[in-house]
C-alpha cells in the first residue's frame, strides 16, 4: 500500500508536458502540494507555443517517417500503430479535462483537418502505394484513401496542383480524421486549471537555479524571482524537469549519475508563413512529403493549415537553423555551459558519427529565403516570394547520449524520460512528437517513478483515460468506441470505418 502522506512536488517549466503532468498529479493526489515554476511571464511561451511548432496532431496518418520500407519492399507500420495509439490516449485525457470542467471550449485548441501524404517520382510513388496497401488493411487506418490521379488531387489540395500537368509522376494518400492542435492554447488552459487548485502554487518569472539533496533524500530547490532578484529555497520529494531545451542544464545541476554522459545539440525550426489571405483560403489540409534521402526525420517538409487565435493561416517547413541557445529566450552560452568533463567525449563522438547531420544543418543555416522558396515550390509551384515571410520558430535540443547498443554519442530522436535511481528526479528531454504524445509520456513517468501508487491510481487513470491498461492496437472494438467518444468530447468529426 502506498504511503498516503502528502508529498511536495516541484515542477519546472510551464510547457505542454509539465502542465499535462501537473494536471494528472492534482487529480491523482489532490492533497499533494504542487509548486510549478516558469522562468518566463506566462505558460507555453517556448516550444509549446502555437507559433513555435507546426501544430500537427501526430497520429501517423501522413508522416511517412513512421512507416519504414524494408529491404524486400514491404512497409513496416508498427511505429505508426504506436504513435496513433498514443495520440488517441492524448485525446481521451483532453476529453476528460473538458467533461470534468478543468478546461472548456475544445475548438480553441483542436480542430479537424485532413492529413495528406504527397510524393513525387517513381520510387516514392511505389513506396506510398505499398504504404497505403499496408495501412488500409489495419483497422486504425482503414479510412485511408490513395490516388495517382491529378484531378482527384486537385479536389484534395487545389493550391498544390496549380501549375501542374498530368505528366508528372506523383501520388497522394489522405485520411480525414486528422487534426490541427494549438498546443499553446491547450497549455494555457491546463496551466490555468492548475492555478485554481487549492494545493498548487504556480509562479511565473521564477527560475530554478540550483539543487541540493539532503541526507534524508529531500531536495532543496533554489528558486530566483527574476523580477526582484530574491532567492528562496523550497523542499521537494519529487522534482519534475519539463523545461524543454532548458532541461539538460537543469538535470546536470542535480548531479545525479543519470545526468552524466548526456548532452544536447540545439536546432531551431524555421518556417515560411503565408501573408496572402487568398492563398491561405485555397488550402485547408496538412500535407507531408518525404524526407530527402540520408537526412534525419526532422527534415520532412510539410505545408500546413493552422488555426491560431481563431484564424486560419498557412506555413511551410521546417528548415533547420543551428545556434548555441537551448531556448528561444535563452543565452548564447547555453551550449558551451552544457559541455562538462564527463560528457565532452560523448559530444565529440557524436560529431564524428553524425557528419551528414552536421553538414545538413550547416547547409540549412546558409540557405536564404530564396532557397526556402525553391523548396516550397516543390509543393506549391506558383508560390510568390512576396506572399511569404521566413519565421524562426521554437528550439529543439537533440539528446546525445551513450548507449550499450549504439556506443558513444548516439543522437536520440523523439522524447526521452530520464530519472534518478530513487525516482525523486524526473526529466523530459528531446522533441517531436512530444506534444502529441504528452499524455503517454506523462503515463510513462507515473508508471516508472510512482510504482508504489499503482493500485490506488489505476482506477483514477481509467476514469481519465478509459483505454488505460488496454491496447487500442489489438482491441478494434475498443479503438472505434474510443474514437467515437473522443470525437464527441472534443467536437471533432467522426468517420465510420469503411
From Swiss-Prot:
Protein family: Belongs to the MQO family.
UniProt superkingdom: Bacteria
Protein name: Probable malate:quinone oxidoreductase 2
Annotated S-S bridges: none
PANTHER family named in the record: L-2-HYDROXYGLUTARATE DEHYDROGENASE, MITOCHONDRIAL
Enzyme class: oxidoreductase
UniProt keyword terms in alphabetical order: FAD, Flavoprotein, Oxidoreductase, Tricarboxylic acid cycle
SUPFAM superfamilies per UniProt: FAD/NAD(P)-binding domain
Catalysed reaction, written as an equation: (S)-malate + a quinone = a quinol + oxaloacetate
InterPro entries membership: FAD/NAD-bd_sf (IPR036188), MQO (IPR006231)
Molecular function as annotated in GO: 2-hydroxyglutarate dehydrogenase activity; L-malate dehydrogenase (quinone) activity
Alphabetical list of Gene3D superfamilies matching this protein: D-Amino Acid Oxidase, subunit A, domain 2, FAD/NAD(P)-binding domain
EC number: 1.1.5.4
GO biological process: tricarboxylic acid cycle
Pathway(s) where this gene product acts: Carbohydrate metabolism; tricarboxylic acid cycle; oxaloacetate from (S)-malate (quinone route): step 1/1
Amino acid at each position: 500500500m502506498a504511503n498516503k502522506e502528502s508529498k511536495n512536488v516541484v515542477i519546472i517549466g510551464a510547457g505542454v508536458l509539465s502542465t499535462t503532468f501537473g494536471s494528472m498529479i492534482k487529480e491523482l493526489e489532490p492533497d499533494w502540494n504542487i509548486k510549478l515554476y516558469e522562468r518566463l511571464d506566462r505558460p507555453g511561451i517556448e516550444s509549446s507555443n502555437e507559433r513555435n511548432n507546426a501544430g500537427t496532431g501526430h497520429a501517423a496518418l501522413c508522416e511517412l517517417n513512421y512507416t519504414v520500407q524494408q529491404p524486400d519492399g514491404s512497409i513496416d507500420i508498427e511505429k505508426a500503430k504506436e504513435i496513433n495509439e498514443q495520440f488517441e490516449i492524448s485525446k481521451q485525457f483532453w476529453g476528460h479535462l473538458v467533461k470534468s470542467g478543468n478546461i472548456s471550449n475544445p475548438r480553441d485548441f483542436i480542430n479537424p483537418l485532413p492529413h495528406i501524404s504527397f510524393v513525387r517520382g517513381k520510387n516514392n510513388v511505389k513506396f506510398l502505394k505499398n504504404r497505403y496497401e499496408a495501412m488500409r488493411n489495419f483497422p486504425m487506418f482503414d479510412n485511408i484513401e490513395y490516388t495517382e490521379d491529378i484531378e482527384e488531387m486537385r479536389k484534395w489540395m487545389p493550391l498544390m496542383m496549380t501549375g501542374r500537368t498530368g505528366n508528372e509522376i506523383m501520388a497522394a494518400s489522405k485520411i480525414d480524421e486528422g487534426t490541427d492542435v494549438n498546443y499553446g492554447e491547450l497549455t494555457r488552459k491546463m496551466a490555468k486549471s492548475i492555478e485554481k487548485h487549492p494545493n498548487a502554487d504556480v509562479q511565473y518569472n521564477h527560475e530554478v537555479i540550483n539543487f541540493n539533496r539532503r541526507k534524508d533524500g529531500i531536495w532543496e530547490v533554489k528558486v530566483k524571482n527574476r523580477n526582484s532578484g530574491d532567492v528562496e529555497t523550497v523542499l521537494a520529494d519529487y522534482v519534475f524537469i519539463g523545461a524543454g531545451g532548458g532541461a539538460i542544464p537543469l538535470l546536470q545541476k542535480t548531479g545525479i549519475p543519470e545526468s552524466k554522459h548526456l548532452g544536447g545539440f540545439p536546432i531551431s525550426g524555421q518556417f515560411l508563413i503565408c501573408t496572402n489571405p487568398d492563398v491561405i483560403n485555397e488550402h485547408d489540409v496538412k500535407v507531408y512529403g518525404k524526407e530527402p534521402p540520408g537526412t534525419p526525420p526532422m527534415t520532412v517538409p510539410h505545408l500546413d493549415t493552422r488555426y491560431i487565435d481563431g484564424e486560419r493561416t498557412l506555413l511551410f517547413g521546417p528548415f533547420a537553423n543551428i545556434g548555441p541557445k537551448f531556448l528561444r529566450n535563452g543565452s548564447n552560452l547555453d551550449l558551451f555551459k552544457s559541455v562538462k568533463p564527463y560528457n565532452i567525449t560523448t559530444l565529440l563522438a557524436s560529431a564524428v558519427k553524425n557528419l551528414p547531420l552536421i553538414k545538413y544543418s550547416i547547409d540549412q543555416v546558409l540557405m536564404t529565403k530564396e532557397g526556402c522558396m525553391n523548396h516550397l515550390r516543390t509543393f506549391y509551384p506558383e508560390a510568390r516570394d512576396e506572399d511569404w515571410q521566413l519565421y524562426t520558430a521554437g528550439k529543439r535540443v537533440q539528446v546525445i547520449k551513450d548507449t550499450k547498443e549504439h556506443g558513444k554519442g548516439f543522437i536520440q530522436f523523439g522524447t526521452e524520460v530520464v530519472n534518478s535511481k530513487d525516482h525523486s528526479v524526473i526529466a523530459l528531454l528531446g522533441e517531436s512528437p512530444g506534444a502529441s504524445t504528452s499524455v503517454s509520456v506523462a503515463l510513462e513517468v507515473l508508471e516508472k517513478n510512482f510504482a508504489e501508487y499503482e493500485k490506488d491510481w489505476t482506477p483514477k487513470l481509467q476514469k481519465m483515460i478509459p483505454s488505460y491498461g488496454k491496447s487500442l492496437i489489438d482491441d478494434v472494438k475498443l479503438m472505434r468506441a474510443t474514437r467515437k467518444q473522443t470525437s464527441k468530447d472534443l467536437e471533432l468529426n467522426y468517420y465510420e470505418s469503411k
